[in-house]
């Protein structure tokens, strides 16, 4: 197993445009981060015309989600899933790991790697960015809100309800790692 200072942060993007620009801003400010893209995330990045400056990017191109083996190698100290679609959150809650992002979450849990999840559907009414800079009103379903609440009870998982909470959770985690490695 590697030492904490050599470990990296794994960031997984799903197919949501909700606060995607802001998530990319955070990603672009971080050091030692690897980016994992679901198939839908790769499409959404192109559709929205967003760019990132991450050097190591893994895409969902294999049936067995080969990149998850990096968690077994002790390569990561933290997994961030942001933004996380209601579909991704539902699969996490149900223990379904049938794509790259849900597999990463499952393997992070099995290897005791802390996860931070920014769920898109956190309030009964939201404004969200759609392609071409359109803002739309979104009304998450009761099941989406319930799944987000259930995810909050999972071990080694922090659920952020907004961008401030996401940024704070990441900074708190990095500070904790820095203290524990000193």
Q: Regions from the language model: what does each represent?
A:
Residues 1-182:
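A cross-family phosphate/adenosyl-ligand binding-site feature
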